[in-house]
Amino acid sequence: PGDHMGSCNNFLGQMGFFAVGHVFYVIYFAGRYFRRVEPDRKLTGKAKGYLAMVVFCALALLCAAFSKIAPGAPAGIIRIGVCIYATLISIMMITAMLQRSSLFALGAILFVFSDFILAWNKFVEPVPYRHYLVLVSYFLAQWLLFIRATKFRVGPEMRLLRF
């Protein structure tokens, strides 16, 4: 539905449907994370460093969104929506990166990248080759999230990302 709203030039609807999608991603990733973690497990130094890096990336994304993108959005509901959406996609990225899966992490990062390009182009300045950048990163993100979340498996000759 979000892509359809975008093709109808309904940015608010597009953003709203994608925000709902991110809520579902967060629910999936958070549920998967908490099913795997033992309650009394302590974080190692390496895990603490990784968690700090994940949170830093999300905060950098939010800073860019709030300082560069949101001010360019029209005041009112669109600007509020952009801020909410940036927060949701950041939470989605954090929960994806906590899965200890390079496919989930890369999928989430590419999803954020595609949306960042869209938002930058719409509210800050034109991005050269934005159509290609968005389409390639968005569909690759969805594919990576799909192949990791499902039972879909590829043979050893096709395993390019073996982590």
PLM segments and residue spans:
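Polytopic alpha-helical membrane-helix bundles and their juxtamembrane interface segments
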Residues: 1-163
